Amino acid sequence: MTSPAKFKKDKEIIAEYDTQVKEIRAQLTEQMKCLDQQCELRVQLLQDLQDFFRKKAEIEMDYSRNLEKLAERFLAKTCSTKDQQFKKDQNVLSPVNCWNLLLNQVKRESRDHTTLSDIYLNNIIPRFVQVSEDSGRLFKKSKEVGQQLQDDLMKVLNELYSVMKTYHMYNADSISAQSKLKEAEKQEEKQIGKSVKQEDRQTPRSPDSTANVRIEEKHVRRSSVKKIEKMKEKRQAKYTENKLKAIKARNEYLLALEATNASVFKYYIHDLSDLIDCCDLGYHASLNRALRTFLSAELNLEQSKHEGLDAIENAVENLDATSDKQRLMEMYNNVFCPPMKFEFQPHMGDMASQLCAQQPVQSELLQRCQQLQSRLSTLKIENEEVKKTMEATLQTIQDIVTVEDFDVSDCFQYSNSMESVKSTVSETFMSKPSIAKRRANQQETEQFYFTVRECYGF
């Protein structure tokens, strides 16, 4: 004899769901902390780069002895206890690789210290300042969008909880109604059997003396049977009604379950990736431009520098947002990995885990399917248009941040008049009218890009 199957109680199902949601909520919180940490590390990196080139400009004026001191200073800083965690977390990212190579290159510098100092102060440092400002601004916007995405995801999870509770309630009502119906059926069978036994046990009497008694007894039995039949009909109707509600509630639960899993998958697989892309929007390209400016100056130095500069150039070539994003997600895999899918939890022996397409819910499901197909067709057309707009906007931003304006070879075209050379190299990076116009266009395009992102999601 097999033991009866043990079903999970409502409290157990709710507790498991709450635990899974709490884990997701904790993961979402850690994601924001991780992005905040990356922003802080990036700001620190950019600040270090600014401090580095500012100090380097001063040292260029004091020749190679002071250049050696600069290299030792920053190498010691990166090896200090305070920066151990920073180095551990960032040693695989391409910008940090460039930073380490720059420190090694300092020992090789030995030419035209006045020109290099002027380029460092009036060209490279303003670029890092610009990158820091842009990065902070974009991160703030990205964080707002990310918070909204997380709020939307939690809203979906809360809606699933509500639908699941409704399913439990209606399924419990259906089971209760079924139990009452079975009880009425048993009473009916019992009453019918009792009536048959009473008729069989009656002793023969004369027609004249027992006619009235038999008629009265039959009337009483029929009345009792009719009452039970009426009660059975009511309970049958109640059971049918509750069963239909339970089926509809289960269908809603299954649909909500599928939608929730799709939303969770979309957030972890697509939205997080896009969110990190937004945080990095233009960062690597702008850093690439700043470091290429440095390379343009350094490549005009003595031939003895070429080996070190080639190594840095290779690192700059490898500045890649996609690779760094992949490394970041691998380093924090437990934060960015998708959670387990929500599984259907059968309630009180209800083992049907598929949508019920039988009458009387078939027509309703067909109508809903048609509505969803129509809506999906409309959304597909809209999304194609939005995708084209996003690609065009993103390409515009990429064109702005990848403009090749890092060549400073003209600064090394010496003439008999050093004043003319100084006048040429002293024109600061931020003072050019075209730069200001391009900056305005960049910010306007960024604003439009995020507006579209916020309206249509990731």
UniProtKB/Swiss-Prot annotation:
Q: Where does the F-BAR domain lie?
A: 22-324
**Which BP terms in the Gene Ontology apply to this protein?**
negative regulation of cell migration; nervous system development; regulation of synapse assembly
Q: Which residues form a coiled coil?
A: 362-400
The record's region (Disordered) falls at 181-214
Alphabetical UniProt keywords: Coiled coil, Neurogenesis
> InterPro entries from the entry?
AH/BAR_dom_sf, F_BAR, FCH_dom, SLIT-ROBO_RhoGAP
Q: Which domain of life is it from?
A: Eukaryota
Example GO CC term: the record gives: glutamatergic synapse
PANTHER family to which the protein is assigned, alphabetical: SLIT-ROBO RHO GTPASE ACTIVATING PROTEIN
Q: What is this protein called?
A: SLIT-ROBO Rho GTPase-activating protein 2B
Question: Source species, please?
Answer: Homo sapiens (Human)
Gene name for this UniProt entry: SRGAP2B
